[in-house]
UniProtKB/Swiss-Prot annotation:
GO terms for cellular component: cytosol. The gene is rhaD. Catalyzes the reversible cleavage of L-rhamnulose-1-phosphate to dihydroxyacetone phosphate (DHAP) and L-lactaldehyde. Pathway: Carbohydrate degradation; L-rhamnose degradation; glycerone phosphate from L-rhamnose: step 3/3. This is Rhamnulose-1-phosphate aldolase. Belongs to the aldolase class II family. RhaD subfamily. It comes from Listeria monocytogenes serotype 4b (strain CLIP80459). The keyword Translocase does not apply. Zn(2+) binds at residues 140, 142, 211. It catalyses: L-rhamnulose 1-phosphate = (S)-lactaldehyde + dihydroxyacetone phosphate. The keyword Lyase applies. GO terms for biological process: pentose catabolic process; rhamnose catabolic process. Keywords: Cytoplasm, Lyase, Metal-binding, Rhamnose metabolism, Zinc. It is found in: Cytoplasm.
Amino acid sequence: MTKDIMDAVFIKEMAKTTSNLYRLGWDERNGGNITYLLDEKEVVEYLDVKQIIRTIPMDFDGKKLAGKYFLVTGSGKYFKNVEEAPAVNLGVIQVSEDGKAVHLLWGYTDGGLPTSELPAHFMSHIARLSVDPENRVVMHCHATHLLAMTFTHELTEREFTRTLWQMCTECLVVFPEGVGIIPWLVPGTNEIGEATSEKMKENRLIVWPHHGIYGAGKSMDETFGLIETAEKAAEVYTIVMSQGGIKQAITDEQLKALGERFGVEAKAGYLNN
């Protein structure tokens, strides 16, 4: 006999995280989406994986994820409602063996579908797993100050990253590889998924100009914390600029010393010699 899935740690983590994202104002209305890669042993405690509720086709090749299980936020669903109604707003899915569809095993009880950004998420999972087999989470949100920076700051990866590093001491330690930036592209398309996943091979944070940010990590906390740290730096930058601009900042020499102390190395070429 399986356990009640409402007691599952992964459901509780997802509900807590989506509530926090909404509370912070980063996922207004139905903005934002999360995919959480689950181990089969986690899933079978709560679900009979042979009981498929329905099969949902995909318009891209997900064969590299064949057989894998994911907890996914629903298309058009509001993050503010997840905690009260997980079964309506979330779904547990398994990628079909041919990679052309997903099998719904639980959730979306009102007939809903996985997030429209599923191609970008799955492509990002494939990219991250190729360089980090422990990656489990891909998270997209509209972090306010990072989004604002894409209108006012130079959109080159090096300069954008350097500004974030200089705003908060912890930034270099948390994301020494910097942030990736893609061009503005139509959301929900394979094109934006391909652009994002290409950047995910080297970065865990990808900025979507005038839209939001993608983050990836080994756990829900790590991924949330990654975005949270970059967003804090962007908020500090916004305040600094409103106060008249930068008069002094963390120097490159100090960033190098910081990296040495915490055992991280800034992305090659991002610090001046």
